[in-house]
Amino acid sequence: MKKRFMVQPLCTGLICAGMFTACMSTGVGAASQTGGSVHAGTGYIPLEDFFKNPSKSRFTVSPDGTHIAFMQAWKNRMNIFVQKRGSDTAVRVTAAENRDIADYFWANNSLLAFLQDTGGDENYQLFTVQKDGSNLKNVTPFKDVRVEIVDDLKDNEHEMLIAMNKRNPQVFDVYRLNFTDDSLTMIAENPGNISGWMTDHDGKLRVAMTTDGVNTGVLYRKTEQDPFEPIMATGFKDTFSPLLMTFDNKELYVASNLGRDKAAIYTFNPETKKQGKLIFEHPEVDVESLIYSEKRKVITGAVFYADKRGYHFFDTQRAELQAELEKKLPGLEVGISSANRDETVYIVRSSSDKTPGAYYVYDTADKSLTLLADIAPWIDSTKMASMQPIQYKSSDGLTIHGYLTIPAGKQAKNLPVVINPHGGPWARDYWGYNPEVQFLANRGYAVLQMNFRSSTGYGKDFWTKGFKQWGKKMQDDVTDGVRWLISQGIADPKRIAIYGGSYGGYTTLAGVTFTPDLYACAVDYVGVSNLFTLFETLPPYWEQGRQMMYEMIGDPEKDKALLEEVSPIFHIDNIKVPLLVAQGANDPRVKKEHADQIVNALKQKNIAVEYMVKDNEGHGFHNEENRFDFYRAMERFFAEHLSADR
């Protein structure tokens, strides 16, 4: 059951998380055979093995526990399949040929709902289909309209709540969708300032999150007949993020950093407008996620991310279940991704840094754990490289956390390195299986990922230290990571590349622009090159956050000099190393103009640049054939300019 929906990535407790993060489906391999790093040899793994579609993925169990759905490739696109629990025979229920299905869920015991966009435009439409594949319908066939799920109303077999920007492209209203006749009834009109909605445990719309671009707030009502009233107002630099209501539907569980640096879990009384009991805190990182039992009506634990994912359990039954699963799957990260209504059948996902893992079904009746599928059975975990948590100091004394992956069988000495800054930038990198990282390591490159300042999860102070620091202190944190690798003797100073997507693409361009002697080459993937263009081309449903972004990045009018100073497009003359630029033609976040501008300017200066554009992609390459093309180009490019010896 979805209890909370934010219509845009602005105030989710990780403010603006993932706004400029490339949305690539990296899958889970014969590659171009040129250059010192891509010849076949001991340990060589075909490129396609890293980036082809998973064997099967995204397993879910029906509410009654009798059927299991999953996604699998058909005609190179991810489609939905359904099988009876205990059976190996599956029925394909969708026939997507042009675009992967983005997400799906069980609407009731016999009906599935799924979201799909067109060519990466992120205007998701909602479809329904019977579990036998019959009666497929597009229930929101509206042009240039984006659909999101507010609440799937698990206890209501005939309806769900969705949000759409149909009336006004800048804001999302809430509609009740009836599956019986496919009717849509607006139940809440957005006055213009609401950025998210939340239901109670009865599916009633009780909470709304607001923003005026700089300040954020929370609205509450006792019943759906009452008007919304404000219960909290903060500046956007503070986190006060409703997670779900208590099970009596009277109070809220919230993630809050009011009066503190790290966000923690509290209760909040909407009648008194007072923050209540501290539920859980972590001394080093933000805590912004709860797990709970809908059947038993208890919160069972909190989830946090330090170097790796961690749990803190409040509930003996859930703690014992976790211990049992970890005992059955030793050495792996284990989580529950789906459950039936009675919580007697669970879908379990395992993974690690060396394997994308597998899905299992766990039956509480006999405590059996049965393998459903390996996500990528062709990946041999014994041939993968270890991802090690690391930390180093920035030039002004901050501790920067990150991950270093050394090629399997190699000493951490004088290696060619790919620096891989994450997108967002208000996001973070995590420990776990990463096909890009493993691919690069298999080709002989060490990979450094770092959570530079303004990465989320490390507290308010660390996050705000990156405001108006694009190309400055945020960039220095990346540069300091490179210099740390060199000082440790890990990196060969003459064989260092930088590659990133979205904000990471900006960091890539800034790296070769502002530290032109540090890198041998660079790969910019759907990256920002011009901050003025960025603000001129925001998607309409990001308008609510424009002023907030001005505070965080810079105002095109008030901070014109700053934006010119840190936009790579205005400093082309500094670039002197080869670039590979990749872009989706339909990108709604970082428009193609960014790539066009940087490529045209480089060509005019006779600077070596390769340009790949995919017409049927958006903010990242989802289609398998496009992933293959991109990584083949990257493989050849790095082989030519870094010459890693295997």
Model-derived segments and spans:
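Beta-propeller domains
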Residues: 70-91
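Mature N-terminal segment immediately following signal peptide/propeptide cleavage
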Residues: 40-74
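C-terminal motif of bacterial Sec signal peptides marking the signal peptidase cleavage site
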Residues: 21-22
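Bacterial N-terminal signal peptides that target proteins for export
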Residues: 2-12
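Cap/lid segment of the alpha/beta-hydrolase catalytic domain
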Residues: 378-494, 501-502, 507, 536-546
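Peripheral, non-catalytic segments that deliver or gate enzyme domains
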Residues: 51-57, 75-80, 95-102, 107-401, ...
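Active-site-proximal cap/loop segments of hydrolase catalytic domains
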Residues: 452-646
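Glycine-rich His-Gly loop
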Residues: 351, 420-424, 584
